[in-house]
């Protein structure tokens, strides 16, 4: 199912989140199970299924990584539940550096500045990856779609690393 069509949006990495939320509320009102309280059992089931579908679509489209995966799926490249590893050695080296920095924060004399530095490093890298990803997603070339998949894998890794940094920061505050 094309979630962009469901929400009457053009398929794009960039989505107007306010418009997305408005369309979500409109769709929810139209199919909400309460509207079908006196309907047949089949109509009630369909309403519940449609509501779940709308919720899934909304969650996918409001999350940039999931939205990018959906765009690739619409082009025939399915990434969900995959276990492909990245072969980008430069990224793998950067990943190791970030992990070392994360470990060093725990023993640092100035953890706040190191945390801020890592957040900034993550943000800059993610912006770079996202800019490349946007260009690759509009392409019709399969090779570009494969590269886009690698960029998505990097963004997924960055999100996990960001979560780890947040946990380290929270632990220091305790």
UniProtKB/Swiss-Prot annotation:
Record-annotated J domain positions: 2-74
Keyword tags: Chaperone
GO CC annotation, single: iron-sulfur cluster transfer complex
GO biological process, one term: [2Fe-2S] cluster assembly
Keyword Chaperone set for record: yes
A Pfam family it matches: HSCB_C
Matches recorded under PROSITE patterns: DNAJ_2
SMART domains, A to Z: DnaJ
Gene Ontology molecular function terms on file: ATPase activator activity; protein-folding chaperone binding
Function: Co-chaperone involved in the maturation of iron-sulfur cluster-containing proteins. Seems to help targeting proteins to be folded toward HscA.
Assigned protein family: Belongs to the HscB family.
Subunit structure: Interacts with HscA and stimulates its ATPase activity.
PANTHER family, sorted: IRON-SULFUR CLUSTER CO-CHAPERONE PROTEIN HSCB
Protein name: Co-chaperone protein HscB homolog
């Amino acid at each position: 199912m094309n979630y962009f069509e469901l929400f009457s949006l053009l398929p794009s990495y960039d989505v107007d989140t306010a418009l997305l939320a408005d369309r979500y509320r409109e769709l929810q009102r139209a199919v909400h199970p309460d509207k079908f309280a006196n309907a047949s059992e089949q109509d009630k089931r369909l309403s519940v299924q449609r509501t779940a579908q709308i919720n899934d679509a909304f969650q996918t489209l409001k999350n940039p990584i999931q939205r990018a995966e959906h765009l690739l799926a619409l082009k025939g490249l399915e990434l969900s539940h995959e276990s492909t590893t990245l072969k980008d050695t430069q990224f793998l080296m950067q990943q190791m550096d970030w992990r070392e920095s994360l470990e060093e924060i725990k023993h640092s004399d100035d953890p706040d500045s190191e945390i801020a530095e890592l957040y900034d490093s993550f943000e800059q890298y993610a912006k770079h990856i996202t800019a490349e990803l946007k260009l690759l997603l509009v392409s019709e070339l399969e090779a570009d779609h494969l590269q886009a998949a690698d960029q998505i894998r990097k963004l997924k890794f960055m999100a996990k690393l960001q979560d780890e940094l947040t946990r380290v920061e929270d632990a220091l505050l305790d």
